[in-house]
From Swiss-Prot:
This is DNA-directed RNA polymerase subunit beta'. Its cofactor is Mg(2+); Zn(2+). One of its GO terms (molecular function) is zinc ion binding. The gene is rpoC. Zn(2+) 2 binds at C810, C884, C891, C894.
Amino acid sequence: MKMLDLYGYTSIAQSFDKICISIASPESIRAMSYGEIKDISTTNYRTFKVEKGGLFCPKIFGPVNDDECLCGKYRKKRYRGVICEKCGVEVTSSKVRRERMGHIELVSPVAHVWFLKSLPSRIGALLDMPLKLIESILYSGDFVVIDPIATPLSKGEVISESAYNQAKDNYGEDSFLALTGAEAIRELLVRLDLHAINANLRTELESTTSEMKRKKIVKRLRIVENFINSGNKPEWMILTVIPILPPDLRPLVSLENGRPAVSDLNHHYRTIINRNNRLGKLLKLNPPAIMIRNEKRMLQEAVDALFDSTRRSYVSNKAGSVGYKKSLSDMLKGKQGRFRQNLLGKRVDYSGRSVIVVGPNLKLHQCGLPKKMALELFKPFICSKLKMYGIVPTVKLANKMIQNEKPEVWDILDEVIHEHPILLNRAPTLHRLGIQAFDPVLIEGKAIQLHPLVCSAFNADFDGDQMAVHIPLSLEAQLEARILMMSTNNILSPSNGKPIIVPSKDIVLGIYYLTLQDQAQSEDEVLFFGDFSHVEYALHNKDVHLCSKIKYRMTYCNYDVEGNKPSYYSKIIETTPGRLILWQIFPQHKNLTFDLINQVLTVKEITSIVDLVYRNCGQSETVEFSDKLMSLGFKYASQSGISFGCKDMIIPDTKTMHVDNASDKIKEFAVQYQDGLITRSERYNKVIDEWSKCTDLIAKDMMKAISVYDEENKLNSIYMMAHSGARGSASQMKQLSGMRGLMAKPSGEIIETPIISNFREGLNVFEYFNSTHGARKGLADTALKTANSGYLTRRLVDVAQDCIVVEYDCKTHNGFAIRSVVEGGAVVETLDNIILGRVAAVDVYNPITEELLVKAGELIDEAKVEKIKIAGLDAVKVRSPLTCEAKKGICALCYGRDLAIGDVVSIGEAVGVIAAQSVGEPGTQLTMRTFHVGGTAMRGVETSNLIALLDAKAKLVNSNVVEDKHGNKIVMSRSCEIVLLDSVGNEKMRHNIPYGARLYVNDGQFVKITEKIAEWDPYTMPIITEKTGIIKYMDLIDGVSINEVLDESTGISNRVVVDWKLHLQGANLRPRLVLVDDNGNIITLSNGLEANYFIPIGAVLNVQDGQKVHAGDVITRIPRESIKTRDITGGLPRVIELFEARRPKEHAIVSDIDGYVEFGKDYYRSKRRIFIKPVDDKLTPVEYLVPKGKHTIVNEGDFVHKGDLLMDGDPDPHDILRVLGVEALANYMISEIQQVYRLQGVRIDNKHIEIILRQMLQKVEIFEPGDTMYLVGENIDMEEVIKTNNSMVKMGKSPAKYAPILQGITRASLDTNSFVSAASFQETTKVLTEAAFSGKEDSLYGLKENVIVGRLIPAGTGFLMNKIKKLSLLNKEDYSMYYDSEYQDPALLQSDSNNFGHDLPKGNNNIVDY
């Protein structure tokens, strides 16, 4: 331990390894107590001294004042340990009043409310009695038979009082034993034989067949086994002694007006003591039984109120009502409870807060600290220095000197502050960049100055934001602040690895202006320059302008293959003086050429330049470069004179034409609707589409008009702001000078009359009123969603907090194949973006040259990504946190690159928390951003066709095509896909072609870029005939299963299928269209089945009974819902739904096997049967029940693959896991979650989502227990099961079989191995009850548990400290052996009995050697 003392590391928090919790026995309560309390008196009302024998008795709890007894006889430290013979008080420190407990001996036992009422009731489960019966015994005076002796009554039977008296008369006084109240329950519990119950339940479990009964038995069996294993006795759930909290934890404080403020607990204790004493006196008087029973009930209620007042059914006892007294449970749970208020978050000394202002002249690592603030914060440091230099003799005089602000004080303050970093924090701290360290610079004034480039990390602006300052005191804290938290060390964002110190707003505008080029300049006016000094001179003399075109002699540098021996050559290039000015601040590196900036730089280019500089030149160069870039940006933004002018909003001349065209088309749709050619929802969809197109066209023309470079005004200011990415966007410009477009109602529906005006023209009253919808919804949403998003972050942090990097390599070869992400035909995320920073799971070869590109277990960095890109690979297998085999955490290689530093992650990094923050932080950002577009509908035109994005060869998969009467090829397959292959045959793109689409290419045909491959109607789902024949209606009965729906506005009737189940005669109908030949025989389709087309509710029939149809004709249409706008408002609930692993409301059914679809002949109540017939006839078909009227997306005879959807809707993640396994689940969840974030333009690395998923997949369900003690259907930790199975195999017994299960993040947080962590999260009383009767141990592995008990967290520096601690406990031989062989034999660490966690291989500099 000496080694630990070096670090000041031994304290009470370090002196234990785990925390255990169990039910307190009466003996242990008495042992903890220093005396029994029988009196309710607190303090004397005249002397204000505490009363002896009362609730604050000094004899029991210790002296009120340090080293002073009550009567004042002994008053010095020298009498410590003496017990005063006069007043009986021990002379000691008054601190013991925070530790010493008392107790109350109860005259009659009472039930502990947690074990009685916390569901499932533990007492009820052990006795196998419903809660209602137990309550009737405890509160209503019913009797329970304990021992029937010689009567026909049965043991445990509950009888009313009258029945009890009747039985006494019938059988005699002592012929049976029946009791009431808590004594009865206690007696029953004492007489339980848990081992016998356990054996009986196990035999019963084997014989039972009913699922409900099984679940009930398993529940009870778990509780019984937990009791047996924990060593708790059942009768301890009934209290005979109540402990009393130490008095300083329930203090009596006198207020200013002399009235005492009493803690609520004292009120509860007084009630209990009063009722207990009264009951004791009553019992001596031998009164009628009813009085005793009433008094006992009141005592029971008083004890209930002390432990948990919310569990009582009284109205007056609801929290928040007048007269409500806080119970012990209330003190623990909720945001204001002990866990969350005092243990996980504490107020901090040495801190201050103030408003922030911008500090453009600061360096990146500095912040401006007001002198007044610094003086107060560093006061103790200044005092000690003043004394040390002998300026003042005492601290008191030093304080006086500081108060008077003498000149010496300022000098010393400068010295103290020098290289002493301070922490700045802005609430809400959504990710770790919300707290960063800076070197303070003293400034006048009262506001903190903040560097502009760190604003995006803090999400700060200067409209009145406040920030808090904290001072790291100890040397270690200062060291950590400087090395880990300094703003210069946090250049990259931990969520996506892109720079977060990027210029924005004015800086971008300045750089954009600096790199512009004058388009109107003629070739004759172009000047030649050979040196930068000449360019500066010409600028000074106004011979050239910043944006003028010039010819310049640029020196280039050539490197040989190894990158050494540079050779120089010159080249004349066309550029501008502005770009040359920018080039002067660039660091020199072979990968940073002038071509990078010889273009107009927008925010996107600037970001990639900062990224390049970081990757090539390192951190310090990047910091310097960013600072210079910022000053340049500010300088030229102010010189440019760009401002927002009314004339800059140019309204395109074509606007009226576009609006007229759209109006004409909409009139056409109205006519079609009147003629009954289209339905109401189709017309609505088409109108919305038309206006969307019109708005886009106007916006396009506006951008064309606005981006023209004219001689007079040069470039348009507003265009420059939007184009550079400094402020505003194309959609905002569209609203300013194009057309505001369609608005959304609060419900998400789109109002079909658009706002034709823009803000430049001004809106009319009607338009203004329409646009208020969206604006208000935006503001209301913001308020609601912020809370939702914050709660999501809290749950994510809680589920992932114990995921830490514990070793370098877990040696696994598992991983996932990664492909690029394609959405709607376009590649939205390229392969190289996804695999960058991951580790290859297997060797990666070039398919053509067979050259080894990446070795297995090697990090894929930028250079390797480039190789993979050149090789044209479309999939790479990489390691993933989900497949990592490390125990108690993950390994560095499965995680890959730490995105914030761009290198392999260090051991001890808390990757779980980083993942949670990365996923949660944008949620809050986005929810706060809903109203930025002012509620305009963000919906694009629905995709209705597929266009080739590259020259390629088309290959059709699962295609079943028929030709219609016009010769068009119609897709008849539900799973038709088109794959585009490049010249080598690598798959470049894969698309689904919907059923009913018109196909324009053949299998194997070459398609050119922009060629149309297929098109379809996005608003209806058709049902199409496969052969030519005559239509016959079956079970389509007017008024039952089909209605003529008359459209009031058009007078035309459509035949619509209605819900036939609602009708009496409709019970056995199966509405369908049948295709027959001329002889009336049903036609057989190509798959050998009859041509029956089943029709769902809501479908519109396109054909009459007896009508002749051609192959490829649409016979019915199912209108799709009109699409609502999707912003993160719809998106955040979706993310929450996925992380909570909830079943979607109307989830699609997933096929469990490969096979052919067959519709069941009978209808089953309100369900419809679908059979999947396996290819192998020996296997039995699988049956699915689909709700009637739901549209199945498969036809009879279709071949479906395992995991295909059989009907519309989102699939259930649990089904995907069960049918297709972990990899498919991971792919589904990642793509769904990323889709929501991508919609908002937020980039999150997949590995963060994978880590959360890993935490959600930690439990398995046992379906065959083998020889283990597990029960069928039980959910157990996967690591534990693997461990048990290994030991079973060693003993030659059969192991348990299990399947992984997916838990939502809340469930997973509550089911964690640490009860301390779970209790501090949610449902505190429930978690503690569960933990207590199971006698749980908490080994303090996670971060949260350690914060709560006051230790260093086992991550980062704490990870190393833990290792040192374990090493210090080794004996000398082991210790030296560990260090001797550490680098020679890595296996020693693997099999380390002391469980040090595994180490880095030799040569990695992340380990500090002590």
